[in-house]
């Protein structure tokens, strides 16, 4: 992903080619089944004597016929590769994936369904340990490539692994809140902000706004702004922007 250039086929679902290269690297001389099969019928005899070569060759051919099948295969194969990769190589692969999905030529994929970005993020989401993708990158990819679900799931996974005082945690919550707002997922938006806000006035104002009591909410947003400027209580820029935006609304 990081060393091969895909510009020449950027308008195609080029994971077909990636999968073909990966499957071609598999040692197909091994047995088809990991354990001996019981029985003397023809099927059992074929399983005992068979190798993985016909199976892998069939996969290489069939995945070219359907992008959805290739998408499903990638989301199965990539996590398996990730699990067996050494830690230092996982870091390299993580960086390569980020560089790939943020490349300008990927914009050709935006109208396609499925598209390469959706598949790459889906494969990353299934990995353990979780890949680390910058929150602003995930928000951009979700909006640009209609990968809302998988990008929000990835943000949530990353959020659980971050320390409460980590600056990245703040940006992750910002990206997740913006994604909820873009999709008009009001209850998720309010729930996230009510858990993370530092001022009780913010919590109460959000509760009023969620209940449709906008006049009461505006009073509390204004009170929070005054308190934030005068009290010396630690304040994040995100919470101040929330007051500003919602007080105007």
Question: Which residue stretches match the model-derived regions?
Answer:
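Eukaryotic intrinsically disordered, low-complexity segments enriched for acidic and Ser/Thr/Pro residues
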Residues: 1-249
